[in-house]
Regions:
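N-terminal beta1-alpha1 cap of cysteine-dependent amidohydrolase-like domains
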Residues: 2-282, 291-363
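Active-site regions of oxyanion-processing enzymes, predominantly non-cytosolic
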Residues: 286-287
Length: 363
């Protein structure tokens, strides 16, 4: 065959006609090389992802500033009610009229872009109401006081909050731990509504109730992966000896008509209690757990400080301040400055290795 081809080549131009098998092998090897190169490039891109900035993929990337919404208040102020004592069992102040606000609550609010005015519960009622006129929302903290003057002041402030919302002003309230418990007592009109639970100094999950609608609630802007983490990881801090079981909560018409249950949790003995509620008709959210501790308290080893736990704290703080920005209250700036928390200095109490790291003490 070779001789015939060579011989023919002497007489005329030779054309090479490869066999089909040869063509198949050539194409197959070429395809393998192409695919190999392609997947190598994909692997390299995945190992070192190229993060494109907006100017790299937007044709018109000329900068433009987002217009301010004139309906929103971009200087919101939150009032935090002080609690009896010094927050350290008398180690920092044994004054009989002492009250305190843990600095973690202040930082919690400030981290979301608001300022704080302390509402000192022992002040005359007219002074407390004057301070309410300077703020765009209120936070009731954790603690132990469930009777006497403190209970009475919480009740009166809560009534004012509802009145302002009924009058058309958006005026949010957060109630944490003790705040949750006192609100439950006030709304249910039952001082004995609470039940004992074994949930002191422990981290836990949050279990969302079946078919719950989180639209408009504190959880609305949580990313899906974080909602899942709340149900699978112990990333919220619990520290309470009382609470309300879902059954008792639902049986009380006043409570169930005012609040919807968003989440439940289990105590050490696996008893289920209501852990997060949202008012049906008001911007009022109550937590049996402590959203402020994950980022701002270090006194106990069981406080979760993972990235997910810190993210929970930030989202919860953002929701409160987002609601406060909707408040139509625009108090005089100088009046706010005269009452703002910056007029006070926090006291470091963390040297004992337990309790609050910092507290604001008022006497």
């Amino acid at each position: 065959m070779l001789k015939e081809v060579v011989g023919a080549g002497r007489q005329s131009h030779c054309t090479f006609s490869p066999s089909p098998i040869f063509i198949f092998k050539y194409l197959w090897i070429s395809l393998l090389i192409v695919f190999s190169l392609k997947f190598s490039l994909v692997d390299a891109a995945n190992s070192f992802p190229n993060i494109l900035m907006p100017s790299q993929f937007v044709l018109d990337s000329s900068p433009s500033c987002t217009k301010m919404d004139l309906k929103l208040n971009y200087h919101p102020v939150i009032g935090i009610l002080s609690h009896p004592g010094d927050g350290a069992s008398g180690r920092l102040s044994n004054a009989t009229n002492a009250s305190y606000v843990a600095a973690s609550y202040v930082k919690f609010v400030e981290s979301a872009g608001a300022r704080v005015i302390p509402i000192i519960y022992t002040e005359p009622l007219e002074v407390i109401f004057e301070k309410l006129d300077l703020v765009n929302g209120v936070l009731f903290t954790g603690g132990w006081a469930k009777k006497g003057l403190y209970y009475s002041v919480v009740e009166k402030i809560f009534k004012k909050i509802l009145e302002r919302n009924d009058a058309g002003e958006r005026f949010p309230l957060y109630a944490v731990c003790l705040g949750f418990e006192i609100l439950s007592m006030i709304i249910s009109k039952d001082r004995n509504i609470l039940e004992p639970f074994n949930s002191s100094y422990m981290a836990s999950t949050l279990e969302f109730v079946d078919n719950v609608n989180i639209q408009g609630t504190v959880f609305q802007r949580f990313p899906p992966y974080l909602l899942e983490k709340l149900s699978t990881d112990c990333i919220v801090m619990q520290n309470h000896r009382f609470g309300i079981s879902p059954g008792r909560f639902e049986q009380n018409k006043e409570l169930s008509s005012f609040f919807q249950i968003l989440t439940t949790s289990n105590d050490i003995d696996n008893k289920v209690y209501v852990s997060t509620v949202q008012a049906w008709d008001y911007p009022v959210t109550a937590f049996q757990w402590h959203p402020e501790k994950n980022t701002f308290e270090w006194g106990y080893s069981m406080i979760p400080h993972t990235e997910y736990a810190v993210e929970v704290t930030q989202h919860v703080a953002n929701h409160l301040v987002r609601e406060a920005r909707k408040s139509s209250n625009r108090p005089p700036a100088q009046k706010v400055l005269e009452s703002i928390i910056y007029n006070y200095s926090p006291t470091f109490g963390g040297k004992a290795g337990k309790g609050f790291d910092e507290v604001y003490i008022f006497t």
